[in-house]
Amino acid sequence: MYVQNLPTAWRCGRFLFDWQKRMRPLVMGILNTTPDSFSDGGRFASRDAALRQAEHMITSGVDIIDIGGESTRPGAEAVALEIELERVLPIIEALRDCGTAFSIDTYKPQTMIEALKLGVDCVNDVWALRQPGALAAVHQAGCGVVLMHMQRDPQTMQFNPEYVDVVADVRLFLAERAKEVEASGVSAEQIILDPGFGFGKSLEHNLRMLREFGSFAELGYPVLLGISRKSMLGKISGKEVHERLAPGIAATIMAVEQGAAVVRTHDVPETFDALRLWEAARVL
């Protein structure tokens, strides 16, 4: 076990990921079925393209695939429930028996309910289940839940975000929200925390959270790193969105060294390559 002070395992729907036996983080592959995602908008909007990408990630060894039908990039407009369902449900239905865990990236309770009916294993919510009905949607479902910190909403979150102390403020929110979700009947073993890189944070805020990522891992829950291809990497490297692999891998290893338990990425094979080297050197 490379991360200390965690629950024994992560209960994620049909799957039980035993932290006691793991020597590397889980890899969560991103599958956006949206036309306007900041990174791959439109590439996987068709069913066939999405399924091919999912198969590529599965062949690469992905632990869980995160399927999203609405972009939450800065300034993104909300989409109607019917459109989101049309985008994600056929993909979940086609892939649910392939032996890999699946997550639904949504904040809409009805989307959660419909995805869970089809057997999705995890709900990944940028609103941390704060929308009315979201807690009820996952109550007693036995699914994993990812609780993310976001200041304001996707439309306004990058308009001059401010904190007294970004690390302390995000830590406090995550700790309090996790306990509130537990009080609703979700067990600690189902919960993953996400500090929300790029969601209501300036470049300085993001860099501080990366430098002090270990402070989130001290909260007693597994912590997810979601930094793949994000604008902070472009601001530092000067690279366009599809050229940010190298800084993304560097950030990943920084966070893993501090206890990241899940790495959410667009670049599954390359992330695995980096983690294999990290693991080999660590267990030598």
Named regions from a protein language model:
Residues 4-14, 22, 39-53, 72-94, ...:
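Active-site-adjacent loop and "lid" segments of alpha/beta metabolic enzymes
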